[in-house]
């Protein structure tokens, strides 16, 4: 079957799961500013995101309702209306870019980053570094009780080893008495 006049990538799914996949990817892109996905999915998601941002430039109630019907996530629609559309107000289109990053090891699918053109990678890495520092501090605080738990596990293992040795000795005694009888 030829693919003439086909407008939709089917992604080997029925319409419901396909819509859910695209809605999820659009929401993730709006929330994080950059997502990693396959090239075909990135191209399809780019269509939807760019149409949504262009619609959001109108800024009226009917546009908000239209976006909510397409993407039922209220936070994502609010981000489109209040953040993304004003940010790209002077840009006539092309709000996203696709950066190919090679092939996925498992199935060799071609992977890509889909990100907004003004995505600030350095700021995101700085935020990530701050979060990792905070998590390191909380991990140190959690290690103190963990040491107690480790000591408790060690004593439990010692008791289990003693019980195992006793059972082994009992088994030998039974075997010896059975051999005598």
Curated annotation (Swiss-Prot):
One of its GO terms (cellular component) is cytosolic large ribosomal subunit. GO terms for molecular function: structural constituent of ribosome. Residues 129-181 are annotated as: Disordered. Residues 145-171 have a biased composition (Basic residues). GO terms for biological process: translation. Keywords: Ribonucleoprotein, Ribosomal protein. InterPro entries: Ribosomal_bL17 (IPR000456), Ribosomal_bL17_sf (IPR036373). NCBIfam families: L17. Belongs to the bacterial ribosomal protein bL17 family. Part of the 50S ribosomal subunit. Contacts protein L32. This is Large ribosomal subunit protein bL17. The gene is rplQ.
């Amino acid at each position: 079957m030829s693919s003439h006049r086909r407008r939709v990538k089917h992604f080997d799914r029925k319409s419901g799961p396909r819509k859910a996949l695209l809605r999820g990817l659009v929401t993730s892109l709006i929330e994080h500013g950059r997502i990693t996905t396959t090239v075909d999915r990135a191209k399809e998601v780019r269509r939807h995101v760019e149409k949504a941002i262009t619609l959001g430039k109108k800024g009226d109630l009917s546009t908000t309702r239209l976006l909510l019907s397409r993407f039922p996530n209220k936070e994502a629609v609010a981000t489109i209306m209040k953040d993304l559309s004003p940010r790209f107000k002077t840009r006539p289109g092309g709000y996203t870019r696709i950066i190919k990053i090679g092939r996925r090891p498992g199935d060799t699918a071609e992977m890509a980053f889909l990100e907004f053109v003004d995505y600030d990678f350095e700021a995101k890495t700085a935020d990530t570094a701050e979060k990792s520092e905070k998590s390191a501090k909380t991990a140190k605080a959690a290690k103190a009780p963990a040491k107690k738990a480790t000591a408790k596990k060690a004593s439990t293992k010692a008791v289990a080893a003693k019980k195992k040795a006793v059972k082994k000795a009992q088994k030998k005694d039974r075997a010896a008495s059975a051999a005598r009888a």
